[in-house]
Regions:
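Short glycine- and Lys/Arg-enriched binding-loop motifs that mark or flank ligand-binding interfaces
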Residues: 13-15, 19, 131, 145
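Nucleotide and nucleotide-moiety/phosphate-recognizing core
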Residues: 2-16, 22-95, 111-112
């Protein structure tokens, strides 16, 4: 496990995923980005938009997703709390797992930190998700999974479903 004092230093190499499959998906994502900026999160890189079928039910509305590389002063739990607050401000409500949503913000990787308590870092299923890996690759071509120690190119190559636009 990577040990560091995130409270004293600004964390680097934090990756967030933002997705939406309800309403005006791009506007929802842009509002989420604005709220992150207003909260003091500094953007280093922002991927293009990627559209994917809803998973696990492709009959539900398609998602649009992006990945951001950011700097922040928050600790991991503070960051996820901020993400959940922004989701709520945009209208996300508690709903069954994998339901359509206005906004979903996930911490993909927090500076290589590995946590398995209340907050799981890196994101537990990110290495299986085309809508995370493709935009992440766009902005960080040399990224390596902190647990699996596999680079992003190999993770993308191993994806069973590469259906993404």
């Amino acid at each position: 496990m990577k040990k560091q004092d995130i409270s004293e230093n600004q964390a680097k190499n934090i990756f967030l995923g933002i997705g939406s499959n309800l309403g005006n998906r791009i506007i929802n994502i842009e509002k989420a980005k604005s709220l992150l900026l207003e909260s003091g999160i500094d953007f280093i890189s922002v991927s293009n938009y990627y559209e994917t079928p809803s998973w696990p039910d492709p009959k539900k509305p398609k998602f649009i997703n992006i990945v951001l590389k950011v700097n922040c002063k928050q600790k991991p739990q503070e960051m996820i709390n901020l993400c959940k607050l922004i989701e709520a401000k945009l209208g996300r409500r508690k709903s069954p797992k994998n339901s359509p949503r206005i906004c979903d913000i996930d911490i993909i990787d927090f500076d290589g930190l590995v946590l398995k308590d209340k907050l799981c870092l890196p994101h537990a299923r990110m290495h299986e998700r085309n809508f995370v890996l493709f935009p992440l690759f766009e902005i960080e071509k040399e990224w390596v999974h902190p647990i699996k120690k596999v680079n992003i190119k190999k993770l993308i190559f191993s994806l069973p479903n590469k259906d993404i636009r």
